[in-house]
Amino acid sequence: MPIFSNKQVRLKRLGLALIPVCGLVAALLLIPTIWGEYARILLFTILLYVTMALSYDVVGGLLGYLYLGHGLFFGLGAYTTALALKHSQPLLLALLLGACLALPAAALLSLPLFRLRGAVFALATLGLLLLGGQLTSNLSWWTGGAAGLSLPPNHDPMLTYSLALILSLIVVGVHWLLCGSRLGLKLSSTRESEEMAESVGINCGQVKRLALIFSAV
């Protein structure tokens, strides 16, 4: 009987897992071409929520913090992307700019936020979300207010859908890798007991800040 190393077993399992994933991706690309625009918009919305849910799970699930301000970073990235598109920037560059702006915002906000715990942390993140919404309304000359921004309809809908699919696949892959990584174990340890995690040498403050940055980007 052949003996396989752990690495070979993991690679074999990964190869087997890629078969249904490739089939699912092919189906997601074919469905909009068969059922038209309604199916494309519906699947685009689902992919968007999958991306949001998995990015939220880094702080809300792996770290175990009740985190009510995730929409702030999502909105910041979305508005940055929309403003870049409105100024005739390429779609890929606009998406990159959105992520690049969310990263320093999360890094800065993580410093005061993670001095708080429990319900106080949850209320603080909710307050930031409400503050972001109020700023959006007050700066309507720039953000479009409650109506949002109107973008030039010069992008191929299937290209936008394909990018959303690629983004969601990247987020799923990164989340899966994170769960099995050292950082993922540190997040789980911090969730169970910050005191115990600190006692074995885990820098809980740094781990929590990294979690928020991962989640925001």
Predicted feature descriptions by range:
Residues M1-V217:
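Transmembrane alpha-helices and adjacent helix-loop boundaries
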